[in-house]
C-alpha cells in the first residue's frame, strides 16, 4: 500500500531473487514469463470533435465547473494538475501558469494527497491564452466571495521530484474550490458531472482526460509544432504526444488534402489517353 505498481514489481523481483539465492525456492516463479503490452485502439482514446466541443461548451456554460473544463481545453492540464493549481503558480503580469504539483483525493483512505507532477518533464510553465487568462482573472477577482470549509486550513507536504526536498501545498491558496462545499472537488466528481453534461448536450460521454486529448488535437490542427506541444503537455517523448494524444479527424484529413492541392502542382495535366 502506498507504492506504485512499478515499485511493487521491483520489490517482488528482489524478494523472489533473494529467496532463490537462499534455497527457499527452487526457481524464480516468473522465469521465462514474458509480458506483452496490450495494443490500445486509437478509438478507445476519446476526444471531442469541433462540433461536439462546441455543443459541450454551450451546455457547460451553465455549470459551476465550466471554468475548470474550459481551462483544461485552453492549457492541456492533467486533472490533478488543475485541482492542485494554486495562486502562486499564476503570474498575471507574465501571463503564465506553472505546473509544479498535483492534488488528488484518495477514496480508499479518505484523504487528500498532494504530490509532484507525473514526471520530471511535467514540470513546466505554460503561456496563457487570452481565454485562459480571463478565466483565471475572473476567479481571482471574485475569490473573497467564495465559501471556504475548515479543510482549507490544512497545509499538505509532498516531495519535489526535481530536488528531493519537501514542498508544501497550502489548501487555502487553491484556485478551484467547490462552490457548494467550500472544498476542492474530488477527481471522480468531475467525471460524474461531465456525464450529465454530455447527456444534456446529446454527445457521447467522455471523461476529464479527454479534454486534455482534445486540447492536443486542436493544437496540432491549428498548426502548432509537435515539439512545442510536447513541452506544453509535459511529455518526455514526442511519440507519446503524437501517438497517444493527437487524433486525426475526417475534417482534418480533408483540410490537409485541400491544403496540399493548393500548394501548386498546377502543371500536372490529365493525360486523356491514360484516363
Please describe what each predicted stretch is.
Residues 58-63, 75, 126, 142-231, ...:
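Short, basic (Lys/Arg/His-rich) helix/loop patches that form interaction surfaces
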Amino acid at each position: 500500500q502506498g507504492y506504485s505498481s512499478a515499485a511493487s514489481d521491483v520489490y517482488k523481483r528482489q524478494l523472489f531473487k533473494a529467496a532463490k539465492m537462499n534455497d527457499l525456492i527452487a526457481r524464480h516463479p516468473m522465469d521465462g514469463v514474458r509480458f506483452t503490452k496490450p495494443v490500445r485502439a486509437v478509438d478507445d482514446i476519446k476526444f471531442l470533435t469541433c462540433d461536439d466541443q462546441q455543443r459541450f461548451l454551450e451546455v457547460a456554460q451553465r455549470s459551476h465547473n465550466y471554468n475548470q473544463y474550459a481551462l483544461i481545453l485552453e492549457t492541456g492540464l492533467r486533472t490533478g494538475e488543475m485541482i492542485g493549481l494554486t495562486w502562486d503558480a499564476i503570474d498575471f503580469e507574465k501571463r503564465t501558469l506553472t505546473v509544479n504539483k498535483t492534488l488528488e483525493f484518495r477514496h480508499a483512505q479518505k484523504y487528500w494527497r498532494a504530490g509532484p507532477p507525473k514526471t520530471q518533464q511535467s514540470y513546466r510553465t505554460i503561456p496563457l491564452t487570452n481565454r485562459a487568462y480571463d478565466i483565471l482573472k475572473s476567479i481571482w477577482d471574485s475569490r473573497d466571495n467564495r465559501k471556504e470549509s475548515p479543510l482549507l486550513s490544512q497545509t499538505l507536504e509532498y516531495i519535489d521530484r526535481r530536488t528531493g526536498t519537501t514542498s508544501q501545498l497550502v489548501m487555502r491558496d487553491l484556485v478551484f474550490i467547490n462552490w457548494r462545499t467550500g472544498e476542492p472537488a474530488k477527481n471522480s466528481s468531475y467525471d460524474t458531472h461531465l456525464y450529465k453534461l454530455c447527456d444534456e448536450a446529446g454527445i457521447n460521454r467522455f471523461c476529464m482526460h479527454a479534454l486534455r486529448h482534445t486540447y492536443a488535437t486542436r493544437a496540432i490542427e491549428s498548426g502548432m509544432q509537435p515539439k512545442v506541444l510536447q513541452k506544453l503537455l509535459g511529455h518526455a517523448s514526442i511519440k507519446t504526444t503524437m501517438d497517444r494524444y493527437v487524433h486525426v479527424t475526417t475534417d482534418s484529413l480533408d483540410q490537409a488534402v485541400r491544403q496540399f492541392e493548393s500548394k501548386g502542382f498546377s502543371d500536372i495535366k490529365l493525360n486523356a489517353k491514360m484516363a
